């Protein structure tokens, strides 16, 4: 479900900085993966997250990303919304109530930045010409000066998860590190 967190936090931050933001989600409702994570209570962060626990061909990326927005930062946001939580094993934090609280918080953060969320669509193609990205939604095209693709991998196909992010990365010449199973800590 971390792809949903990343997407929503990226969108909220950009929107709150005055950017016009549109989130396209192929799911019928946002946060579908969050709602099933942690048995419906959402394992929303891990206070033991550290750069050396990430598999990457660029270990400095994890260090830089985690220094800019830490698990403590996200926990402070959760606390500011009055969401009760508890720690399970190895620093895993879960909602006392429901994962719906985290989804609502993320959507509210986006709303503070006037982020528009469109659900139920399917991105057919993405192109880049003359400094702009065009996203074909099957009959409608959205154009933007910047594009962030934040998707999960193909881990839960029955939820609609696909490898589309890998295809898009390759399309734009980005190096792809093939995913592999990893234990959750």
Regions found by a protein language model. Give the residues of each.
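Short, small-residue-biased leader/transition segments that mark boundaries at the very start
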Residues: 1-5
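Conserved Rossmann-like nucleotide-cofactor binding loop
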Residues: 6-7, 29
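Glycine-rich FAD pyrophosphate-binding loop
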Residues: 15-39
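An anion/pyrophosphate-binding glycine-rich loop and adjacent beta-alpha core
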Residues: 28-30, 35-36, 44-51, 84, ...
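Glycine-rich active-site loop/strand segments that organize a redox cofactor
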Residues: 41-89
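Short beta-strand to alpha-helix junction loop
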Residues: 62-70, 89-108, 154-164
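Residue-level signal for inorganic ion chemistry
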Residues: 78, 106, 169
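Predominantly flavin-linked oxidoreductase catalytic cores and closely associated redox partners
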Residues: 110-185
């Amino acid at each position: 479900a971390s792809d949903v967190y990343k997407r929503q936090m990226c969108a909220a931050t950009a929107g709150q900085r005055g950017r016009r933001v549109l989130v396209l989600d192929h799911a019928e409702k946002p946060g579908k993966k969050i709602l099933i994570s942690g048995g419906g209570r959402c394992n929303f962060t891990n206070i033991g997250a550290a750069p050396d626990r990430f598999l990457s061909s660029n270990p400095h990326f994890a260090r830089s990303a985690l220094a800019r927005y830490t698990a403590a930062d996200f926990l402070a946001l959760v606390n500011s919304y009055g969401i009760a939580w508890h720690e399970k094993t190895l620093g895993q934090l879960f909602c006392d109530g429901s994962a719906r609280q985290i989804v609502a918080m993320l959507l509210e953060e986006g709303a503070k930045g006037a982020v528009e969320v469109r659900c139920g669509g399917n991105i057919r193609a993405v192109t880049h010409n003359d400094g702009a990205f065009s996203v074909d939604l099957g009959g409608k095209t959205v154009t933007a000066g910047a594009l962030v693709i934040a998707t999960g991998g193909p881990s839960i196909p029955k939820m609609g998860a696909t490898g589309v992010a890998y295809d898009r990365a390759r399309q734009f010449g980005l190096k792809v590190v093939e995913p592999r199973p990893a234990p959750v800590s």
